[in-house]
Amino acid sequence: MKILVIQGPNLNILGHREPHIYGNFTLDQIHNNLQAQAKQNNAELEFFQSNFEGEIIDKLQECIGGEYAGVLINPAAFSHTSIAIADAIASCGVPVIEVHISNIHAREEYRSKSYTGAVSAGVITGFGAFGYHLALMGILQIANEIAALKAQQNNQNA
């Protein structure tokens, strides 16, 4: 099972960016922890980070009819502004879980609305870097349930 992990703008500078909000973890450390967790669950991860909205949309569109069983995404500030990324999530054809390091509901008012979260299967927010662990557990559970249902349908049709 292959899961796509998409990281949005400014996440490439985690560890340096406002550590009082986002902690001291770097993106590489988060990815290494996710990779270890995925290995324990017989899953493969592909990581993608971009500061550009269109590149994130292009990557989500690769999920259509593709090899991914699900997406874990931290759209960062784009979650509050990008209807285009929300549309790409809604039409990518696989379950998506949104994750935020900080609690977006406890910050500035404009951060409390998530266009992308509204079209995701779930949203994990405010657990720091551990939120990625929770999000991966969630997307693996959903993807496994979908795979089991598809197998059951195939057995009934055989």
Curated annotation (Swiss-Prot):
Q: Which UniProt keywords apply?
A: Amino-acid biosynthesis, Aromatic amino acid biosynthesis, Lyase
List the GO biological process terms: amino acid biosynthetic process; aromatic amino acid family biosynthetic process; chorismate biosynthetic process; quinate catabolic process
Q: Which reaction does it catalyse?
A: 3-dehydroquinate = 3-dehydroshikimate + H2O
Q: Give the similarity note.
A: Belongs to the type-II 3-dehydroquinase family.
Task: Please list every transmembrane segment annotated in the UniProt record, as residue ranges.
Answer: none
What are the site positions for Transition state stabilizer? R17
Matching entries from PANTHER family are given as:
CATABOLIC 3-DEHYDROQUINASE (PTHR21272:SF3)
Q: Where is the active site?
A: Y22, H100
| Pathway the protein takes part in | Metabolic intermediate biosynthesis; chorismate biosynthesis; chorismate from D-erythrose 4-phosphate and phosphoenolpyruvate: step 3/7
Q: What does the UniProt function comment say about this protein?
A: Catalyzes a trans-dehydration via an enolate intermediate.
MF-aspect GO terms: 3-dehydroquinate dehydratase activity
> What NCBIfam families has UniProt attached to this entry?
aroQ, PRK05395.1-2, PRK05395.1-3, PRK05395.1-4
Q: State the name under which the record lists this protein.
A: 3-dehydroquinate dehydratase
The record's listing under HAMAP family reads: AroQ (MF_00169)
EC numbers for this chain: 4.2.1.10
What does the subunit comment say? Homododecamer.
List positions binding substrate: N74, H80, D87, I101, S102, R111
